């Protein structure tokens, strides 16, 4: 979605010309869930004057009830009309930043927190941090009650066409809706697993790209239901097939120059690119809980399903955590392959950026690239060349996060503490459950 700039007068004009009936004021909580306050268009002036309030104590991870009043400050550049609402009175969306009653940004707002880390980046002389995400999702059939089943919509494979790929019509409608909302779609295809899909859209600056991810998820789920399908961004909904990732392709800029590109070096990369990569590798264990926030996330990060399990980097090899795609010039970027679509994009990107800046500020040295298939190396071979494992459970990821000051700085005290507390509860709840697998394994034997 290309960057646009709107004024209050523009918004008033759009609302009147398009006969908008409702305004949806959208924000994202710490767990990555989209929240919204919907108001009639008669409240537009109040919205434009940053006077819309909501109860922050009702949002998980925000505040206690005694300090609950919050204000929504809309980002006017995020104005869009949902195409599917035309028949019932048009609904427009504005993404908002959350502010406290004293007029300062709320420390628990992931979007505002990302802006804080971007300011730190600017203080180091960089002007832009761009993100190109690659979100994947599964489509499951709905039952007669509208509940998701475990029946996939097709048995297609990577880049398959209809009739094997029965989700093609749904995917095409999703693309059309996204384009109507201003997205620049680059590709749309079936992924490796049956029922799995990927739609790639053009990179954008950090905040806009994260806004786009949240909008993308909403559109995918909405249009899927119109096709009697349930779209899920759960990282590993099925055993024995590839899970869904959301690779982050990131690049730093100084003005119009890509700070990662140097045509005079062997790999075409600058010292800044190597230092940034070194910082991401150094802090990878610490940010894994943020980039892979569910118990289920770690069912994806296992050998054999094209997801990274090991902390290393390479130019072409897809088995390490970081890959440097072959494009150079303005397209020079690094691809962080561990991120999954359940991640809060604002928090995941803040953690990755802070990690990279840690590498730049401390002039960290990147290890040698690993060009062999790490999945085929045994533990002794990996340890001999200094390759660490990513955390294998949410519990070990949270432990690594608690020990990492860079990630604490990336998220700020409020988000950091609330996230760890919420995810620790989730882990404790999971570990005390008795699963169907356990009953199948042990009920008769013992």
Swiss-Prot record:
Keywords: ATP-binding, Cytoplasm, Ligase, Magnesium, Metal-binding, Nucleotide-binding. It is found in: Cytoplasm. Mg(2+) 2 binds at residues 136, 191, 198. The lineage of its organism: Bacteria, Bacillati, Bacillota, Bacilli, Bacillales. SUPFAM superfamilies: Glutamine synthetase, N-terminal domain, Glutamine synthetase/guanido kinase. It catalyses: L-glutamate + NH4(+) + ATP = L-glutamine + ADP + phosphate + H(+). It comes from Staphylococcus aureus (strain MRSA252). Mg(2+) 1 binds at residues 134, 247, 335. The keyword Ligase applies. This is Glutamine synthetase.
